[in-house]
Every structure is written in structure tokens, then in C-alpha cells.
Amino acid sequence: YCYICHSLQYNADLQPANTCIYLVVTWVMTVLDVLPNVYIGTIEYDPRTYTCYFNYVNNPAFTVTIVCIHFVLPLIIVGYCYTKIWIKVLADRDPAGQNPDNQFAEVRNFLTMFVIFLL
């Protein structure tokens, strides 16, 4: 997304210092993402699988929040990025050489890729 839609800023954004900042932000967000599991749910041991797991089944609000954060939000972000890339690619193409049948095929291919990503 950054390379295609923001190509002029791409090299400036991926300097070593900025890359380190992006890595730190990613790790901080990951830790913040796990913290609700520690404070809201309970950690239980499953002797059948010899593992510990977070038990938050009795809290439906927490379950809905987790689904929104872990599924809906990434889906919206990826959908936005794919749409912006698609718009950029279509805008940069030569409109004189386009065939209406090709446009329909391109839309169908884009939607197929997006649905496959969803699955």
C-alpha cells in the first residue's frame, strides 16, 4: 500500500530510525492487545492438552470486543488498502485502450481476490 499509493514518501518513511519506531509501535500494540485477556478473563489449565488458556466465555461484551479488534478492524484496514491500490492502478492506466469487457473482468478479479482474503 505505502509503496504503490505513497511512492514519493516511501523511501523517506522507511529509514532505519523510522523502521525501528514502527517495530516498537507494533510490539507495544501487541502487548496492549493481550492485556485485556489478563485482567478480564481467567487463566485456566486444561489437563487434556497440557496447556493454559484464557477463559472469558462468561463475558459476552469482551468476546464481541475481541472479535471486533481481531477480525473486523483488520478486515476494514485491508479492504481500505486494497481499494486505494485498485483505484490508484485504474487511475494510472491508459483509459483509451480499455475495453468494457476487460473492465468487468478486472472488477471480477478484484472482488474474487478480496473474497478469498476474507475466507
Curated annotation (Swiss-Prot):
Membrane topology (Cytoplasmic): 1-17, 84-113
Cellular component GO terms held in the UniProt record: plasma membrane; postsynaptic density
Record field: transmembrane: 18-38, 63-83, 114-119
GO molecular function, a single term: melatonin receptor activity
Annotated compartments: Cell membrane; Postsynaptic density
Role noted for this protein: G protein-coupled receptor that plays a role in numerous physiological processes including regulation of energy metabolism, neurite outgrowth or cell migration. Promotes self-renewal and neuronal differentiation of neural progenitor cells through activation of the NOTCH and WNT/beta-catenin signaling pathways. Modulates the KAT5-dependent glucocorticoid receptor signaling by modulating KAT5 subcellular compartmentalisation.
Family named by the database record: Belongs to the G-protein coupled receptor 1 family.
Subunit annotation: Homodimer, and heterodimer with MTNR1A and MTNR1B. Interacts with KAT5. Interacts with RTN4 isoform A/NOGO-A. Interacts with TGFBR1.
Name of protein: Melatonin-related receptor
Species per Swiss-Prot/TrEMBL record: Rattus norvegicus (Rat)
